[in-house]
Amino acid sequence: MRCVTRTRNWWRRAARMPRAGSSAWWVAVCKQVCTRVGTYAVCWCSWNTGRFTGCPSWKDFWKPVGPALHVFNVKCEAQRGLKLTQPFTVACKIDPVLCKSGLGFPPQLFTGCVYLSTYTYPWQAQAECVRCPRDSNRCKRITPSACL
């Protein structure tokens, strides 16, 4: 079974489900939702219209449960001056076996997420891709082809 995103350009080619046993990068448009916890903001993704063939809905992922592995790295984006209310696009590395099993994607799998841009659609994010290491304020700008 292949799970293919309904996006365009290089995203479609890069986001296809590979052979079993390998990992895949998935791209989905999400809106950043934030809430204040103490002196800092906690943000997560609110998925919409992320349709995939043969896969669970993206709406099942990234619930507002507070600081956890699946919460977007706010410290890194605050360093770059990103407005917390802007939409952004992320690509996350997941295990395709879980997709095939229909179990969905547990939050702990979202450990290799790449921040792409503040644009609404993923094919608009080709010009800018920033990788933010976990627990680090230093973001490394990388070429779009290296994002996935």
Curated annotation (Swiss-Prot):
Main location: secreted
GO cellular component: extracellular region
Keywords attached to this entry: Secreted, Signal
Compartment list: Secreted
Superkingdom per UniProt: Eukaryota
Signal peptide (UniProt feature, chain positions): 1-35
Protein name, per record: Putative uncharacterized protein FLJ46089
Native species: Homo sapiens (Human)
